[in-house]
Amino acid sequence: MALAGPLKVCIVGSGNWGSAVAKIIGHNVKNLKKFASTVNMWVFEENINGRKLTEIINTEHENVKYLPGYKLPENVVAVPNLSDAVKDADLLIFVIPHQFIHKICQEISGKVHRNALGITLIKGIDEGPEGLRLISDIIREKMDIDVSVLMGANIANEVAAEKFCETTIGSKNKEHGLLFKELLQTPNFRITVVEDADTVELCGALKNIVAVAAGFCDGLGCGDNTKAAVIRLGLMEMIAFANVFCKGPVSIATFLESCGVADLITTCYGGRNRKVSEAFVKSGKSIEELEKEMLNGQKLQGPQTSAEVYRILQQKNMVNKFPLFTAVYQICYEGKPVEDVISCLQSHPEHM
């Protein structure tokens, strides 16, 4: 690897999770000579009570909109211009809603040196004319850099509060994975590096669909046994989907890492996909209304991912092999009754 230190880090994104990660990286680079001591964080500029969000972050060292109550290290610098933020960066941490990745990559393509490395923390997938496209593939194609992925049972506020958790880095180049582990690991944020990067990334996207189904169950008052069935059948569909759509071999062991079963459980019991989906059942409001009310306007990944997965399954003529994924899509977008989530469990092919 031809990167010479100290390595400059740029975080592309500054929402709830991006800010929590900035807190970790800002602290870590102060103590590691391998990394430059200042970290750029690209912030989509917003006005908060008449003040620019970047100005608030750079003076008060807190993202008052997306991670209120947690101080960011003073060496994390909020930069409103994307090209300025990534200038001379050696390591790029992508942590934005997945629907913006094309636009962001187009904007910075050619502005990052060719030895730079990326890691995506983005939980989502995309669809192309050939079917499934992973976010890491899009970054790799548009920017011509090597890209690792990080996924795990990581609710952002708990990470920011330094409560113990694990996470998984997937990297086809072990050396690159270990470099990002060095940048990100703390005593309370423990990292395992695996080479099955595509499965790690798929887990991070697909578990949000299952969490929506879990939220529907909570809204219907179904109880813990039903939710356990949602989690198990959801995991079976995740594994089946990976076996069909991953280009390389899929290791079942990857599903036992933090990115797999652990992230699935935490998202189905905590996490915003579950919470908003429960409110969707109880309030009768649309997902869009609830995003505005409950998430400060941030986007929910589960419903969008279910729509992308549904279109990919349609292309392959495999919709009825994934009844849980399909039910979530149809309830969110086609006005099907929420009770369909239960009937899809009752007649699931796993039981036939």
Curated annotation (Swiss-Prot):
Substrate binds at K123, R272, N273. It catalyses: sn-glycerol 3-phosphate + NAD(+) = dihydroxyacetone phosphate + NADH + H(+). GO terms for cellular component: cytoplasm. It comes from the Eukaryota. One of its GO terms (biological process) is glycerol-3-phosphate catabolic process. InterPro entries: 6-PGluconate_DH-like_C_sf, 6PGD_dom2, G3P_DH_NAD-dep, G3P_DH_NAD-dep_C, G3P_DH_NAD-dep_euk, G3P_DH_NAD-dep_N, NAD(P)-bd_dom_sf. It is found in: Cytoplasm. It holds the Pfam family NAD_Gly3P_dh_N. NAD(+) binds at G13, S14, G15, N16, W17, G18, A156, R272, K299, Q301. Belongs to the NAD-dependent glycerol-3-phosphate dehydrogenase family. This is Glycerol-3-phosphate dehydrogenase 1-like protein.
